[in-house]
Amino acid sequence: MRGKVGTAVTAVVAVLLGAFVTADAASVRVRCETRGDRSKISVDGNDLAPGSYTATLKSPASAASGVTAPAKTAVGDEVEFDFDSNANDVAAGATQISQSFIQGNTVRGEIVGGGVSVSGTATCRVKN
């Protein structure tokens, strides 16, 4: 009888450990757009643990410093950050950046919190 119980416990532990190993890793998607008079960037995190997160942008992607958005709480497993130079979008909750924030047509976004740090780089779409 002990052998059967030990085998059952081992099987349950193996299944639980397998669930942790196969869980989706946190990811980030960075999108950006630039116009002559506007910079617009979104940094979206997915497969995140519950918690509070911040997002930091750098442009060009290799810049030493950047702009950090106020902390947000993940909803489900997602958190979204918007950065914009348009006053209406800033009034609607986007973090303000300058019209000329995007340099070299690239940005790097990083989401930090909940014990993770994920980052990504994007080449910006140019609109006239």
Where does each model-flagged region fall?
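Bacterial N-terminal signal peptides that target proteins for export
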Residues: 1-9
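Bacterial N-terminal signal peptides
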Residues: 10-18
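Sec/Tat signal peptide C-region and signal peptidase I cleavage site
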Residues: 20-25
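Short, surface-exposed binding/anchoring microloops in extracellular/periplasmic proteins
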Residues: 26-68
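Short, aromatic- and glycine-rich surface loops/edge beta-strands on solvent-exposed regions
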Residues: 55, 96-116
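Solvent-exposed serine/threonine-rich low-complexity stretches and specific carbohydrate-binding patches
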Residues: 62-86, 122-124
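Short, solvent-exposed, Trp/other aromatic-anchored flexible loops in extracytoplasmic proteins
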Residues: 77-103
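Edge beta-strands of extracellular beta-sandwich domains
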Residues: 115-128
